[in-house]
Design a protein with these regions (language model features):
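His/Met- and acidic-residue-enriched segments that coordinate or traffic transition-metal cofactors
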Residues: 1-102
C-alpha cells in the first residue's frame, strides 16, 4: 500500500494542495519586487511613475490569474477578473503615455 507523504506539521493534505497557488503567488511577487528594484530610475517622476505602475499592475495581473486558477472564493475570483479587466486597460494607457514621452 502506498501512502502520501505526511503533511508538514499543522497542515492537512488539503491545505497543502490549496497552497500551490500561494507558492506561485509568492514567487510572482518576489520576481516582481526584484524587477522593480533592478529598474533604472530616470529621475523624471512621471516616467518613473508610469514604469513602476506598469510593473505593479503586471504583478497584480499575475496574482489575479493565480487566484482564478487556484482560489475558491467566488467573491475573490470576481474581484480578480475585475482587476484583470481594469489593470489591463490601465497598462495600455501607461504604455500609450510612455510611447508619447520617450
Amino acid at each position: 500500500s502506498t501512502s502520501a507523504a505526511p503533511a508538514p506539521m499543522g497542515m492537512s493534505p488539503a491545505q497543502m494542495q490549496k497552497g500551490g497557488g500561494s507558492d506561485e503567488m509568492m514567487k510572482a511577487m518576489k520576481s516582481g519586487m526584484d524587477g522593480m528594484q533592478k529598474m533604472q530610475i530616470s529621475g523624471d517622476t512621471d516616467k518613473d511613475f508610469a514604469m513602476l505602475m506598469k510593473m505593479h499592475h503586471q504583478q497584480a495581473l499575475e496574482m489575479a490569474k493565480l487566484e482564478i486558477a487556484h482560489g475558491e472564493s467566488p467573491e475573490l475570483k470576481a474581484m480578480a477578473r475585475k482587476i484583470i479587466k481594469d489593470q489591463t486597460k490601465e497598462i495600455a494607457q501607461l504604455d500609450a503615455w510612455m510611447k508619447k514621452h520617450p
